[in-house]
Design a protein with these regions (language model features):
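Conserved catalytic/binding loops enriched for acidic/polar residues
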Residues: 269-610
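Divalent metal-coordination and catalytic microenvironments
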Residues: 144, 202, 261
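Zn2+-dependent metallopeptidase catalytic core
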Residues: 132-156
Length: 610
């Protein structure tokens, strides 16, 4: 709306394109035209048109019993308010979104037998899906069947091929009675797992998972970059069908998880020790994270020579636990009385790292695209592998007679992978460990990451970020794909990282944590001192990157002194370091090469205090 400056609707240019009616829903596709103050060029009508679909869905006549959210278990949920509460306030209520699964045989279910649900969850595979990928789509859906057995159900989720028009002329993927996985021909590199739920109870009525064709490209590239050093099967852009198929299967499982009601659990990837991820027996049994719902896509920790390694994610113990909690049927209990049984289930497991849930915040153990319990060690292994990949990138991506287009694409994505490994460590600085818990459980939800670990992180960055990363600047490689700009790209990565570390938000958070959060965290003063000694180390050889970092650090310190939003406590420290930079630079203006003298002259100019 803001992009096009959309105003009122133009009724003369708006109309219904198509209307379809089914037993439980109506689908209306129409073109809506709006007056626009920022219409695209060469548009004399000053309007923009959009094709929009609206769905009108008949809700169930019989309400499904609700299940209240326990925040220690990740679940998509609806927020409601109870205005009849006796608590002298309106109570906020969270109701989870889930399918209506009820056992056919209540007596057998009560005896602990596996029982089929009255109405299983059925997904129809889009006929547009390439034939060779359909078995992997089916496996990705039905992998959850084993998980549902933990909740007492067998054959709870089923994958079927969509019938042809000859087989069933009334079948349509637009019919709300049929959930589906759609295969969409587009350059988008993604997959999604949306769902439609009853706003009264949270009952999931239908979902249409979408697989975008070009998502294959993302997985092909990242498989090579993140596992190629230790995984011979990944050392090509002609990824074997079985390997790509396994990746598709796991993406489908992830999206089905969303459609079942599960959100991302970004804490799950930090449960396993980093060194265990180098063990073939461990990874084959346990995977690389405790859930498929984390963004822990690849095992980038395993090193060349490690044997029988699992490189791709799979379902794990957290998936069993969360599905059992969400779908276990309690026939003799109400939504209120079942809370006791459900709470006991969570109390037993929620403090075990295998079953912890976390969605974000400032917790270094709740990150995306990471694996292992130690971000520093994991990133060390990741960068070590990436160096091997870069040294072989030309050979692995380009065949004789081909252009260097793929090499260029993979090199650019290499920078992105390297950046992720670096930022996994940056999050430790000023980090606060967050554990979702309730009163009565040991410890407290928030604790500062101890200073020793934060100093380890700074030392890692000193070696792997602030020092010139010559392995990313190999002229024999760069000369094939770029005529300019690589040095600037890498310097901008350093500058962006420095700005992140010395952001007002992070520094204020560190000051606040010093005074209000349990734990021996790193002080912001110690952080600034460590960075100063990193950038202005005695007798440190100067190259373009070091000089640029010294300038950027000086500019950042100077700017922070004048920031109104920064806690005043820190400004005297910053001013003292600004003076120290001036003093250090002043000493060096009369020694060394001309270029170095000029550099330090400039530093004295920008650090001088009027």
């Amino acid at each position: 709306k803001k992009q096009f400056g959309i105003g009122s609707i133009d009724s003369k240019r708006s109309f219904i394109d198509e209307l379809k009616s089914f037993k439980e829903n109506i689908e209306i596709r129409h073109t809506l035209t709006y007056r626009s103050s920022k219409a695209p060029k060469n548009n004399s009508t000053k309007t923009v048109s959009f094709q929009i679909n609206h769905s009108i869905i008949l809700l169930p006549t019989e309400l499904m019993p609700i299940r209240y959210l326990d925040p220690r278990v990740g679940w998509f949920n609806l927020k409601k308010y109870n205005y009849s509460s006796e608590e002298l306030k309106s109570d906020e209520i969270r109701v989870i979104q889930r399918w209506r699964l009820e056992p056919k045989d209540l007596d057998a279910y009560a005896q602990g037998e596996l029982v089929e649900p009255i109405k299983p969850i059925v997904y129809y595979i889009d006929p547009a899906t390439p034939i060779k990928w359909r078995p992997y789509f089916k496996k990705g859906i039905e992998d959850w069947a084993k998980v549902f057995e933990k909740a007492g159900f067998k054959n709870a989720i089923i994958a079927k091929s969509a019938p042809s028009e000859e087989e069933d002329p009334n079948f349509s993927l637009e019919d709300v009675r049929y959930s589906s996985i759609r295969y969409v021909a587009t350059t988008t590199r993604n997959a999604t797992g949306p769902r439609v739920s009853d706003p009264r109870t949270g009952e999931i009525i239908e979902s249409d998972i979408i697989w975008y064709h070009n998502h294959l490209r993302s997985y092909r590239n990242r498989y090579l970059l993140e596992t190629g050093a230790a995984n011979p099967k990944a050392r090509t852009l002609d990824t074997p069908e079985g390997e790509i198929g396994e990746m598709i299967r796991r993406v489908i499982s992830h999206e089905v998880g969303h459609a079942l009601g599960l959100p991302h659990n970004m804490k799950a990837s930090s449960a396993y020790p980093v060194d265990s991820l180098r063990s073939g027996s461990f990874t084959q049994k346990n995977g690389i994270a405790t859930t498929i719902m984390d963004y822990a896509r690849y095992n980038y920790v395993a090193q060349p020579g490690d044997e029988n390694i699992r490189f791709v994610r799979q379902l794990g113990p957290y998936d069993d636990y969360s599905i059992e909690w969400g779908y276990r049927f309690f026939p003799m209990k109400t939504s209120e009385t079942e809370k006791v049984s459900l709470r006991k289930m969570v109390d037993k497991k929620s403090m075990n790292p295998l079953y912890m849930y976390g969605s974000g915040g400032n917790d270094p153990k709740t990150q995306t695209e990471n694996i292992g319990d130690d971000p520093i060690k994991a990133s060390y292994y990741g960068i070590k592998n990436l160096k091997i990949v870069v040294s072989n990138l030309d050979e692995w991506t380009t065949k004789k007679g081909q252009s260097y287009e793929d090499l260029n694409e993979l090199y650019n994505e290499t920078i992105g992978v390297y950046r992720r490994y670096i930022y996994h460590v940056i999050k430790m600085i000023g980090g606060i460990n967050e554990t979702v818990m309730v009163k009565g459980q040991d410890n407290v939800p928030y604790q500062s990451l101890n200073a020793k670990e934060q100093k380890r992180a700074l030392s890692f960055l000193g070696q792997n970020l602030w020092q010139t990363q010559s392995w990313l600047m190999n002229p024999n490689l760069i000369s094939k794909i770029k005529s300019k700009g690589i040095l600037k790209v890498l310097q901008n990565l350093q500058f962006s990282a420095l700005n992140q570390i010395l952001s007002i938000r992070r520094l204020n958070r560190m000051i606040s944590a010093e005074n209000t959060i349990i734990g021996d965290g790193l002080s912001p003063e110690a952080l600034i001192e460590k960075l100063f000694h990193t950038f202005f180390k005695e007798n440190m050889p100067l190259d373009d990157s070091v000089m640029a970092l010294q300038i950027r650090f000086t500019e950042r310190v100077k700017k922070l002194v004048n920031e109104n939003e920064l806690n005043p406590k820190l400004k005297s420290t910053l001013l003292a370091f600004q003076k120290l930079i001036y003093k250090t630079a002043k000493k060096k203006t009369k020694i060394g090469k001309v270029s170095e003298k000029n550099h330090y002259l400039y530093l004295t100019k920008i650090s001088e205090i009027p």
